[in-house]
Structures are given as C-alpha cells and as structure tokens.
Amino acid sequence: IDAAIKELNYIPNANARSLKSKQTYTIGLVIPDIVMYSSICYYIESQLYENGYNVIICNTNFDHIRENKSLNSLLERRVDGLILATSGQNEQLIKRFEKSGIPVVLFDRMQPTLKGNYILEKHEQCIVTMTEYLIENNHKNIAYIKGPKSSYVSEFRFGKFKEILKKNSID
C-alpha cells in the first residue's frame, strides 16, 4: 500500500478525514485590521501550527458586514474553534458558534452579553495611566480620539477618560 501511495502521489482528502474524525483541525481567526494585529496573528498561527491546526485568517477592515460574512463562512467550514476581535455587532452569529459547541475566544474586545473566554489588555489601567500622565505634566487641552460607539471597549475607555478629567476639574 505504501508503495502505491508513493507511486501515485496520493494526497489524503482532508474533508473526508474530517467527516470521519469530526474535526477539521482548522481554527478561524477574525481580526479587524491585519496591519494592527499582524504580530498577534503570527503568534496565534505559530502556536496552532505547532499543535497540528491550520488557521483561516479573516481581515474585516472594521466592517461589521464583512465580519458577518466571515463568521458565516467559518461556520460553513465547520472550524474547530474561533478566535475573534469582534466589531461588537454580530452577537447573534457568535452565539450560533457557542450553540454549535464551537469554542469561542474573544480577544482585545469585550462583549458583556456573551459567555466564553476573553483575552483582554488592562484597558482601565492603560487609560488611567495615560490620562494621569498628561494631567501630571500640566496638560489641560487633552483631545481623545476614540473608536466606534459599537465597541464596548472603546466606550469603556472613553468613559474612564472623561471620569479622570472630571475628577481633576478639566473640561
């Protein structure tokens, strides 16, 4: 059999194998910006590869419609897991992953209404440290450029920023 496999250059069908094993050995990684998340993509892909998994990277360009299409495509492909930095507007679709038994890990974004695992930076500590640094250095006209209102993290950071300014009597 081994000689025939070698002679015919036989390549096993991954789809057929996944039907039997009930695993695709594929993880979906959905990110809003490939440039901003390139390092994280590299490390996630490297770790998954070392553990026998392939990664489908979906770059949504901060477009919730594109994110929706990417999530649907990953569901159709029966990925074994989903790692996601969500726009925050596809909650029902993400819940479909959970209902299907597909593990979901959300990173860099918080969706308080979703169960699951989160990997988050210390958003509160970061915004407090940055804002207090500016205030301690006597800056009074501090501008804040924030992300979309649909982003829980963006709104959380902005709320903390305003709270610190108010506490320091800065308009």
Question: Which ranges hold each PLM region?
Answer:
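N-terminal helix-turn-helix DNA-binding module of bacterial transcription factors
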Residues: 1-25
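Bacterial carbohydrate/catabolite-sensing allosteric modules
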Residues: 6-9, 43-56, 69-78, 91, ...
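Short beta->alpha connector loops
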Residues: 10, 33-36, 61-64, 85-90
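Functionally critical, cavity-lining and gating residues within the transmembrane helices
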Residues: 12, 37, 158
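Short, composition-biased local secondary-structure segments
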Residues: 13-15, 41, 60-65
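Conserved beta-strand edge residues that scaffold enzyme active sites
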Residues: 19, 33, 62, 88, ...
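Short beta-strand segments enriched in small/hydrophobic residues
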Residues: 19-40, 133, 141-148
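Intrinsically disordered, low-complexity polar regions and short flexible loop motifs
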Residues: 82
